[in-house]
Amino acid sequence: MIQVISSWEIGWNYPRMESDMWEMVLREFNVDCQCMMPKSGIKAHENQTFLMEYNDVAEAIDAARAAGRSIVFVDESGAEELEAFTHPADAAYVFGRTSQNLMQLYMDANQGDVSLKVLTPNNTGLPFGHQIAAIVLYDRFKKAS
């Protein structure tokens, strides 16, 4: 199972609009579950059949761990580079908000969790989560082919 966990870019966009940007990428790469926070109430929309909302990222990560998924933090400060990464079969990829360093979550990470980075020419951390998710999911697809 493939799961993606991230936060709404509150103040930049509306969750309803942002969910469409995420959904297009995630469905194309057969992601099973999209987990977003904080709760916005858009789950009731008929096209959001695989969207789950949580109060915060820790709650979503705890649920993924309880389901037996490997936690993969994707961040510009990640320890492992995407090129050398072997994707777990059951994975929950955690993306922060734009320019949000996930280092605090790494500090709370369980042994076995991975911190992954996608190198870009400027490595500023500015691409949106759904943009980096497309790169990570494409890498997963190509390595599985």
Task: Give the label of every model feature segment.
Residues 1-145:
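Post-transcriptional modification and biogenesis factors for structured RNAs
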